[in-house]
Amino acid sequence: MKAILIDSSASACSVCVTTDKVVTGHNYVSMDRGHASAIVPMIESTLKGAKTLFEELRFVAVTKGPGSFTGLRVSLAAAKAIALSNNIPLFGVSCFDAIASRVKNNRNLPVTDLLLIVIESKRKELYVECRDKSGTEIIESQALSISDIAGRFESLYQPGESVRIAGDAGGLIVEAIAEIIKPSGPAFTEDFSGVDAFDITTTKEYWALFNSTAKLGYTYQMDLNYLRKPDVSIPKIR
């Protein structure tokens, strides 16, 4: 079973192609803008490198946010075009889930009591979510300022708990979080990488897609998760 995974939710574009759960093609390019012009050539080159044709794909997965308004729509449009033209399912994966799964599956990193994920928004508020070691959300996904993130974290942090900060905006809150956990002794660990399409391969949603051997037709099972209102809206008709 072959699949293509796509992300352009933040300051990068990435594409991953898999065959029977094995990665056969992967491209990742950092970029602050130009996602719309980069994504299709990247998809084509990744498929070519993986020796995979569009008609061989069985499903498409794409990150569904939170992230850049434009970036999320760019990757969704590309993913939807592939799914529709090949009559295959389209699935969405949360950026928080992708990062959390990447961290969890990295055997070089020790397990921590808390995982604080912080994603860049290019605005004053950052996208944040915090999970305990069982994966339960203890700060639900939302957009908060650095001071509000620190306040919420301090209210739930228990002395002695180990912490990992992950996500491309993790570096922005290090100082505030360090002050909270410093009296307790243990240092936090870091994984300040943004989302990569490759991270989708570590999620439980991705692995669940292989449970069915039947060829499925086009389905659209996702909504983009922006976590905040757009900066520009259509004026109301008076």
What label would you give each PLM region?
Residues F59-C95:
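DPxDG-like acidic metal-binding loop motif
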Residues T52-E55, P110, M222:
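Structured loop/turn residues at beta-strand edges in well-structured enzyme cores
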Residues S30-A38, F69, R73, A77, ...:
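Residues at secondary-structure transition points
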Residues M1-K64:
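N-terminal beta-alpha supersecondary unit
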Residues V22, G34, P89-A197, Y226, ...:
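Surface "functional belts" at beta-alpha junctions
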Residues E190-R228, V232:
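Glycine-rich phosphate-binding/hydrolytic loop that grips phosphoryl groups
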